[in-house]
Amino acid sequence: MSIIKPAIIIGNGPSRNIIDLEKLVGKAPLYGCNALYRDFNRWDYLVAIDSGMINELHKDRVDNGDLIIPPEEERWESIKYNSNGRRRTNAGMVAADYAIRHKNNLIYLLGFDFILDGEDSVDNVYKDSKNYGPETHALEEDNYNRMKYFEWFVHEHIGVSFIFVVPDHKIEHCKSVRAGNVRAMTTSEFLKKLEK
């Protein structure tokens, strides 16, 4: 039996707003995405893949914790997934990849709202702020490709468990992921687990 090594990836979907991120500190390594530093500075790793955000981080001299700015090659879907017409990935997927590289085998996904139905699935807590203009807004139809890539990614990491943390009232509105190593958990259940 292997030792469970959890990590928490903090995405930028609005569902993460119901969690006091301070309560996560010290429970597991925290991997944040892009502009998280604007609201919360106790992350262990912060991942940025877009030029505007990378410039903002450098300009603001963000250096608490480890800043992960992957090489350009890692800012796109894996060539193993799609060698032709690779799509840009997102900081959350890159953060999950780095968490696995750091030997974590239980990945909690907060604010990964593409798992939800409807408009909530494409909203962002930083929408319409600096570096989050209309050109960055996701569309619901983008979720099909996001989900397909996520399913491929988790199949590539079959020894890792992935848990989407979603608001209690949205648990019935999660999309189905075709992978045995993925499930959803309510925010209440997640917070109780942290208290143990």
Annotate each predicted stretch with a short phrase.
Residues 1-196:
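Metal-ion/cofactor- or nucleotide/acyl-coenzyme-handling active-site neighborhoods
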